[in-house]
């Protein structure tokens, strides 16, 4: 029995009536500005592996752009007591972080000798100088005035980073929402110097404990607490994979930006963004 001949590829496309002429129409590449996007990878070394290094960091910056978009929208929604949209946005941020965690697996295919060959071409450029990442840190509440300095050479970038530094963080707005819900949040947590890191407060923990003990009554508040927990959990995983990837590639050498490298990154693992939400789990 002879097999039925398959339809020619050209005929399939014709039958589907696919748009093929883009002389006067916007194409996929036009919409995404792919010429500019794919022209932005400009290795400085002759090393094959530099393309991996560049693409890893550029794609991370694109995901961070989306993170900032979602975080700012989530903060605005919480300010307006629009919790359902905020939940969707915060869940998306957590998923973006999962994507960024998995991306470390690709960079980890670079061996120590391969990185050492391209490292001299990086000069003092380092990931901690990322102005998008710094805004994310500030919006999540990890305020550090010293980290404004790497952006002082660009007034436009400094203005962006400073705006995030001086604004209430995601957690600050979450606490304000609890207060508007009738929960006993101390005034010191509601009106303070937003440029300072948040410090845990027993009264704030009591407010969150009330939410978790009466979750049916405070369902939106409870869901907000869990979305924040998801986000910080994902952020911690990203930080951890950052540490382990750097350690397997450069060991304990100093970072290109002048930090102690892995030692510095390990210190960042100790940062807690939403302290009472974690502590209440012990006290429930």
Swiss-Prot record:
Assembly information from the UniProt record: Homotetramer.
BP GO annotations: L-tryptophan catabolic process to acetyl-CoA; L-tryptophan catabolic process to kynurenine
Listed EC numbers: 1.13.11.11
Cofactor binding, per record: Binds 1 heme group per subunit.
Annotated family: Belongs to the tryptophan 2,3-dioxygenase family.
Sorted UniProt keywords: Dioxygenase, Heme, Iron, Metal-binding, Oxidoreductase, Tryptophan catabolism
A single GO molecular function term of this UniProt record: heme binding
Reaction(s) this enzyme catalyzes, per UniProt: L-tryptophan + O2 = N-formyl-L-kynurenine
Matching Pfam families: Trp_dioxygenase
Classification via NCBIfam families: trp_2_3_diox
Organism for this UniProt entry: Bordetella parapertussis (strain 12822 / ATCC BAA-587 / NCTC 13253)
Binding site for heme: 242
Obligatory cofactor(s): heme
Pathway as given in its UniProt record: Amino-acid degradation; L-tryptophan degradation via kynurenine pathway; L-kynurenine from L-tryptophan: step 1/2
Role played: Heme-dependent dioxygenase that catalyzes the oxidative cleavage of the L-tryptophan (L-Trp) pyrrole ring and converts L-tryptophan to N-formyl-L-kynurenine. Catalyzes the oxidative cleavage of the indole moiety.
Name of the protein in question: Tryptophan 2,3-dioxygenase
Binding site for substrate: 53-57, 115, 119, 256
């Amino acid at each position: 029995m002879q097999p039925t001949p398959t339809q020619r590829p050209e005929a399939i496309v014709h039958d589907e009536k696919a748009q093929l002429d883009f002389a006067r129409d916007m194409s996929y590449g036009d919409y995404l500005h792919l010429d500019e996007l794919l022209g932005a990878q400009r290795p400085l070394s002759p090393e094959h592996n530099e393309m991996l290094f560049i693409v890893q960091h550029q794609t991370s910056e694109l995901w961070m752009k989306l993170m900032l978009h979602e975080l700012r929208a989530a903060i605005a929604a919480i300010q307006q007591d629009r919790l359902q949209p905020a939940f969707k946005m915060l869940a998306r941020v957590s998923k973006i972080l999962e994507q960024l965690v998995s991306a470390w697996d690709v960079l980890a295919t670079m061996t120590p000798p391969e990185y050492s060959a391209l490292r001299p071409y990086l000069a003092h450029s380092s990931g901690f100088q990322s102005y998008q990442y710094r805004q994310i840190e500030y919006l999540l509440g990890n305020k550090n005035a010293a980290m404004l300095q790497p952006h002082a050479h660009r007034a436009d970038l400094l203005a962006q980073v400073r705006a995030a530094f001086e604004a209430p963080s995601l957690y600050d707005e979450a606490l304000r929402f609890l207060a508007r819900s009738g929960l006993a949040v101390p005034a010191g947590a509601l009106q303070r110097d937003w440029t300072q890191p948040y410090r845990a407060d027993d009264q704030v923990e009591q407010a969150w404990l009330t939410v978790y003990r009466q979750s049916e009554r405070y369902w939106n508040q409870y869901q907000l607490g869990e979305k924040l927990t998801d986000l910080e959990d994902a952020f911690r995983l990203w930080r951890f994979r950052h540490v382990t990837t750097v350690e397997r590639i450069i060991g304990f050498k100093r970072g290109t930006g002048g930090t102690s490298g892995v030692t510095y990154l390990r210190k960042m693992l100790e940062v807690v963004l939403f302290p009472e939400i974690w502590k209440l789990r012990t006290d429930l």
